Amino acid sequence: MSTVNVQIGLHELLNGSNAQIQLSVPQLVEKVLMRNEGKLTSTGAVSASTGKYTGRSPKDKFIVKEASVADKIAWGAVNQPISEEHFNKLYIKVLEYLKEKEELFIFKGFAGADRNYRLPIQVVNEYAWHNLFVHQLFIRPNEEELATHESEFTIVSAPNFKADPAIDGTNSEAFIMVSFEKRIVLIGGTEYAGEMKKSIFSIMNFLLPEQDILSMHCSSNVGEEGDVALFFGLSGTGKTTLSADPNRKLIGDDEHGWSDNGVFNIEGGCYAKCVNLSHEKEPQIFDAIKFGSVLENVVIDGQTRIADYNDTTLTENTRAAYPMHAIDNIVLPSVAGHPNTIIFLTADASGVLPPISKLSKEQAMYHFLSGYTSKLAGTERGVTSPQATFSTCFGSPFLPLDASRYAEMLGEKIEKHDAKVFLVNTGWTGGEYGVGKRMNLGYTRAMIQAALSGELAKAETAKHDIFGLEVPRHVPGVPDEVLMPEQTWADKDAYKVKAIELANEFKENFKKFDSVSEAIINLGGPIA
């Protein structure tokens, strides 16, 4: 099947009598309620459930193995190949399925807040609530932009269409397929809305580096003087909490590009975790959940329609989707200058990494590639040993290219723009998990404040004798002994054993990067 035929099929779908194009937020909310896809909560948000898929389904994600990209993609467990034949046949079936629907919902918008690099996209949805979701998550066009909008990538989403693995070449009924040649994302079998958001991010992680733009899985904010900070970190490291600063404006909470002009948000909204959400802890997110926002898999009281953010009956991965303008203290459009400060956040449950350390360019590239944090394995059975988790570039599931490409670009940009990089441990101190305690949030905030102000750039440091990190000897508002992790352990020998154990896990993980330069390994990694 040719690309021409594919485009004809899509053209027919987009121009069918059932196509509802660019409905407003109130219209979409009405459709959601009329079609019984969700409920209205006490704050006016739409609440929807995603059925059995309450998170991303990485084993069901594929990239079509096409001649134009075959030698560019880092094929493997993350980027699984699927044949053009399988994709084409499944695509035709999905189009035929959607043509029969009473209504389809179509959103046209952009990914990328910098107008020089934005990607015009369109999304075809079987569900009205999914269309409301993409309306809030991507960048919405004004009337003039909509009139001239020509999509360069299309998401076709049919959650109720189930694949047959025996025929369709999939691993299950669910599928998320990207064809770079046909500029199509095909999603079916899963109702989890995050698949649409992350598919576009994966696409941008392929397209932006080709324009010499580093795509990044991070949050970012900007100070009153125009100083920009990036926060990288895996789930549970405090990225959202620490980047929400009343004295700084939010550029974005999750996906960014770094071009020759500076930093820009890829999205037009936020997709925030809301497990245990409270107004006291995270007022910005709490107050954003209002009319037009979408709650995903949050338990709602049947009578009062009040959301119970502590109830994880459906999943711990409860989410809220809302547009950037739903929160105060933001930059619009979501663009800013070059980063002055880059923070890598890790929650080290072994309690051996310093609470803050300065990184050289090589160390920054090493820790960027490593993407380390801890997961607590088996705590429900009383097992207290933490499990080291490494997610390349703090975003392994979304990187189509070889990881070294992103690391090299980061190194070049750090050097060119003299960005200062810090590794911040928000995990344990005074011992590993079960012995020590979680790092004091007030201390972490003080350390980040000192990094952002430029104070730590000139601070006196001591080299960590196992990890080779430069640890500040003094940070205002933080006891000096807290800065040196060994000093917080009662058993100094036990600290050394645990630190060497973690250093070895870093080294073992790094063996997979066979295309990385020797300088990054020799100058960036542990020294013991």
UniProtKB/Swiss-Prot annotation:
InterPro entries: PEP_carboxykinase_ATP, PEP_carboxykinase_C, PEP_carboxykinase_N, PEPCK_ATP_CS
Binding site for ATP: 198, 217, 233-241, 282, 319, 444
Cofactor names: Mn(2+)
Residues of the signal peptide: none
UniProt KW Ligase keyword: no
Family matches, as CDD domains: PEPCK_ATP
UniProt keyword terms in alphabetical order: ATP-binding, Cytoplasm, Decarboxylase, Gluconeogenesis, Lyase, Manganese, Metal-binding, Nucleotide-binding
Pathway: Carbohydrate biosynthesis; gluconeogenesis
The EC number(s) this enzyme carries: 4.1.1.49
GO biological process: gluconeogenesis
Pfam name, any one: PEPCK_ATP
GO MF annotation terms: ATP binding; metal ion binding; phosphoenolpyruvate carboxykinase (ATP) activity
Cofactor note: Binds 1 Mn(2+) ion per subunit.
Residues that coordinate or bind Mn(2+): 198, 217, 254
Gene Ontology cellular component annotations, sorted alphabetically: cytosol
Chain's role: Involved in the gluconeogenesis. Catalyzes the conversion of oxaloacetate (OAA) to phosphoenolpyruvate (PEP) through direct phosphoryl transfer between the nucleoside triphosphate and OAA.
Protein family according to the UniProt entry: Belongs to the phosphoenolpyruvate carboxykinase (ATP) family.
NCBIfam families for this protein: pckA, PRK09344.1-2, PRK09344.1-3
Name of the protein in question: Phosphoenolpyruvate carboxykinase (ATP)
Gene source species: Bacillus mycoides (strain KBAB4) (Bacillus weihenstephanensis)
Gene designation: pckA
